[in-house]
């Protein structure tokens, strides 16, 4: 059958060795729009290698490269065009350094049956080459039209309540060239740069990478709630609810709930939700 959870989960995976330096981090940050306040020391720390802080979402770059081969591994027989990135979850074990040599272990964690779609959960465990754990990234990927194979439907979603006045509401503009810059960090999907490809996919023009939106919103939360301290992020998860066109403005809202913040990001120009069911977990 196209999706076989037992085969997929049992299939051996290969660790990926990777490394980064300050230049790679700087490019990622600029791809998220960092540097817009050129006289603010807290903002400059994202774009000046002399005192560089690293957003934890940078870890999706090596994490994605590690899990990419597992997307079409044994037990996962489908057309890649059916794949839709549904959710992203990050757990930070230690702050990311500006330079590092790392190893990421990919894992097929689960394959759930969602009726009309399959849900593939891939996990990337990233550690330094001396064994220090840095982060865990989970990629939840919907495979459209590949459900109904009789598997486990997975855990129920957690309760979600964003009533009341938010602790933070901030507007985050995206640049018309945002996707063109972000793709330089490695995601060269033509959906984000080729107008013809985007039109065939049903969009008016190329859309922004979901993981770019994910990183931009995380930065807004770090700046607005954590005093710009990237090391204060313990976890960050979000559901990709809608697309963003480069040049649009995100309105990010966060509600304090016990030890975490519930977060939502909307597109101001179209009144649609881009990120939902998002949770920031400070250390």
List each model region and its residues.
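HotDog/MaoC-like acyl-thioester-processing domains
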Residues: 1-14, 83-170, 244-247, 251-283
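N-proximal short alpha-helices
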Residues: 1, 63, 69, 75, ...
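Catalytic-pocket segment enriched in acidic/His residues
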Residues: 191-192, 196-277
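Hydrophobic, proline/glycine-rich low-complexity stretches
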Residues: 1-101
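A contiguous, surface-exposed recognition patch within enzymatic or periplasmic domains that forms
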Residues: 2-47, 158-213, 220-223
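Residue-level preference for alpha-helix termini and adjacent loops
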Residues: 19, 43-46, 54-63, 82-83, ...
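A broadly conserved detector of short glycine/acidic/proline-rich loop/turn motifs that flank catalytic sites
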Residues: 24, 31-32, 174-176, 185, ...
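Phosphate-binding glycine-rich loops and adjacent basic patches that engage nucleotide phosphates
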Residues: 21, 63-70, 140-145, 174-185
């Amino acid at each position: 059958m196209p999706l076989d959870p037992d085969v997929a989960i049992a299939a051996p995976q290969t660790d990926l060795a990777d490394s980064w330096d300050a230049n790679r981090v700087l490019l990622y940050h600029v791809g998220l729009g960092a540097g817009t306040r050129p006289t603010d020391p807290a903002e400059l720390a994202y774009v000046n290698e002399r005192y560089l802080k690293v957003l934890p979402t940078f870890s999706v770059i090596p994490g994605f490269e590690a899990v990419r081969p597992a997307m079409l591994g044994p037990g996962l027989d489908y057309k890649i065009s059916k794949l839709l990135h549904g959710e992203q979850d990050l757990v930070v074990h230690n702050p990311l350094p500006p330079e590092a040599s790392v190893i990421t272990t990919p894992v097929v964690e689960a394959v759930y049956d969602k009726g009309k779609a399959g849900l593939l959960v891939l996990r990337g465990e990233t550690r330094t080459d001396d064994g220090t754990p840095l982060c865990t990234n989970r990629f939840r990927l919907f495979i459209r039209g590949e459900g109904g194979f009789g598997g486990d439907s997975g855990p129920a979603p957690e309760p979600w309540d964003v009533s009341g006045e938010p602790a933070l509401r901030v507007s985050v503009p995206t640049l018309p060239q945002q996707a063109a810059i972000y793709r330089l960090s490695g995601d060269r999907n033509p959906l984000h740069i080729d107008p013809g490809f985007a039109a065939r996919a049903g969009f008016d023009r190329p859309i922004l990478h979901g993981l770019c939106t994910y990183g931009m919103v995380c930065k807004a939360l770090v700046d607005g709630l954590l005093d710009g301290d990237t090391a204060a992020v313990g976890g960050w998860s979000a559901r990709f609810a809608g697309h963003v066109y480069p040049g649009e403005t995100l309105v990010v809202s966060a509600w304090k709930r016990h030890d975490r913040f519930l977060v939502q990001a909307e597109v101001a120009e179209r009144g649609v939700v881009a990120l939902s069911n998002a949770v920031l977990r400070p250390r």
